[in-house]
Regions:
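Anion-binding and metal-coordination hotspots
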Residues: 4, 66, 73-86, 96-487
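Basic, short loop/linker segments at the boundary and entry of helix-turn-helix/winged-helix-like folds
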Residues: 24-67, 72-73, 384
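A short, ordered amphipathic alpha-helix with a cationic face
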Residues: 4-8, 54-56, 98
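Generic alpha-helical segment signature
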Residues: 11, 24, 37, 58, ...
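Short arginine-rich
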Residues: 91-95
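Hydrophobic alpha-helical membrane-insertion signals
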Residues: 1-29
């Protein structure tokens, strides 16, 4: 029999408690039980006046509003406020009554501009939630997985301009210069002189009065701090690169935000400085991080770098570099035709150049597989930190390392997939690197807290079941009491 009473209860007046309307297993209830949000007051106390001014909005509520947005992947702050107006669980989480007015969607933006801009508040919130995970001993920092993903910026790919940008200094530049000169002196060469461009040179010559290298980059007119990123063979977008580190259990340990046109190996140091003191034994990363500088940095700090095989970039039909054997004693290379490539110089990039004799190579039967140079001279380069790269190759072939590297898809890559699928991480509505860092910090904080809350609830449920089991056997089967108490 069909019942038709859908509209009869709309005008009812009832008395109820807000707490009764939120299910006991609701995610926001679990999160609220997992952490004491009062720590936010200590973080923002210096941002508010103590003895004058109008009463402000509760800072905890102010932080919880974007937290709801990133937790549920709501596309904008405006839509988040609309959802809060009609969602009882959201109101309960924020401490609002049914008839309380929800803050305007621009409230958080104004507070960010006036109070939180140019501060590390959101990174501190991420760190505080991470400390809770450490407190429950859920994190194992012995194996750390590092990777980067790109988040599409709020910028039209057709609105851009070209500008000349100075090449940013590498984090190992000073140390590399020092070791290059030491290597040259050990080989009887003079130290390299500092580059000095003639200030009279016109810009068309590529020179600059301060001696810095320059390059032409594409800059968005909407979000100049984003970077031009090649997304595929036929698609380029403005984006931000988010580097992330996590442990083998999927807990996010740190992050850094950079323009999308900067290579992961160049921006690795900013992330590494945040996590290097947490007790890392093995650091796992993809081939983008396999550089001599990163290998040396990790090995010098006593960390085992686990980096994959990197395919040689040799042209088809030519000998690969591995076919030229390095003789460490005589410091030379031996080609497939058993001819010597002797040391020639050490260049500014830190590579030793080994060259063959053009007269000898001219009549070599393997010449077409070796070089295309007009003078028939083959040049093979070797970085001064190449021994560290060779150590990485030895580590890669150790027993068990292949299985550890395979965990990347179950850890850091899974985190990126979850963030993009459930937490609105495919693109950002924020403009500027600072706001992007806020989004990343709160998104990763809510992912860690969501996981922590569920684990605490699951653990509490198991504990309650054990207590009931113990009471049952204590009352009805006294013989088993001693055995259960010992367990």
């Amino acid at each position: 029999m069909m019942t038709q009473n859908a509209d009869k209860k709309r005008e009812q007046i009832q008395m109820f408690c807000m707490d009764d309307l939120v299910p006991q297993d609701h995610l926001l209830r679990l999160i609220d039980q997992a952490i004491d949000w009062s720590f936010i007051y200590d973080l923002v106390i210096d941002k508010y006046s103590a003895d004058n001014g109008r009463p402000s909005m509760d800072p905890v509520m102010l932080i919880k509003i974007p937290f709801i947005q990133y937790l549920y992947g709501i596309r904008s702050m405006r839509q988040t406020v609309k959802e809060i107006e009609v969602n009882v669980a959201y109101r309960w989480f924020l401490g609002l009554e049914m008839m309380d007015k929800v803050p305007h969607f621009s409230t958080f933006g104004k507070n960010y501009t006036r109070r939180f801009k140019d501060t590390d508040l959101f990174e501190q919130i991420f760190s505080r939630i991470l400390q809770e995970c450490y407190k429950y001993r859920l994190i194992d920092p012995s194996e750390v997985f590092v990777d980067a993903t790109h988040v599409k910026a709020r910028a039209n790919s057709k609105k851009m301009r070209k500008r000349i940008a100075d090449e940013e200094a590498l984090f190992f530049e000073e140390q590399l210069k020092k070791e290059i000169n030491e290597d040259r002196e050990a080989h009887g060469k003079k130290p390299l002189k500092e580059k000095k461009e003639d200030p009279k040179d016109p810009p068309s010559c590529g020179g600059s009065s301060d001696g810095k290298e320059e390059k032409t980059v594409k800059e968005s007119t909407t979000d100049p701090e984003s970077g031009w990123f090649r997304k595929g063979e036929h698609k380029n977008v403005f984006a931000y690169s988010v580097q992330t580190a996590c442990d083998k259990n999927g807990w996010i340990l740190g992050y850094s935000v950079n323009p999308g046109n900067q290579h992961d190996s160049r921006t690795f140091k900013s992330l590494y400085d945040k996590i290097k003191d947490i007790g890392i034994q093995t650091l796992v990363a993809d081939a983008g991080y396999k550089t001599p500088a990163i290998a040396k940095l990790l090995l010098d700090d006593g960390i085992t770098p686990l980096l994959p095989y990197k395919r040689p970039m040799t042209k088809d039909g030519f000998f690969k570099k591995a076919e030229y054997v390095y003789d460490e004693y005589f410091d030379c290379y031996v080609c497939p035709n058993d001819q010597v490539l002797a040391y020639h110089t050490t260049n500014r990039s830190g590579y030793r150049e080994y060259k063959s004799c053009g007269i000898v190579c001219e009549g070599c039967p393997y010449l077409k597989q070796c070089t295309e140079s007009r003078d028939h001279v083959k040049v093979v380069t070797r970085h001064i930190w190449e021994p560290h790269m060779e150590k990485c190759e030895d580590i890669r072939h150790m027993i068990g390392m292949k299985e550890v590297y395979a965990q990347r898809k179950e850890t850091v890559e899974r985190l990126f997939g979850t963030a993009k699928e459930n937490h609105g991480f495919r693109y950002t509505q924020m403009i500027g690197k600072a706001r992007m860092e806020m989004k990343v910090g709160l998104t990763f904080a809510c992912m860690n807290l969501k996981k922590l809350a569920k684990m605490i609830a699951r653990k509490g449920k198991r504990g309650a079941q054990k207590c009931l089991l113990l009471i049952k056997y204590t009352l009805f089967e006294p013989k088993t009491r001693k055995t259960l108490l010992e367990c």
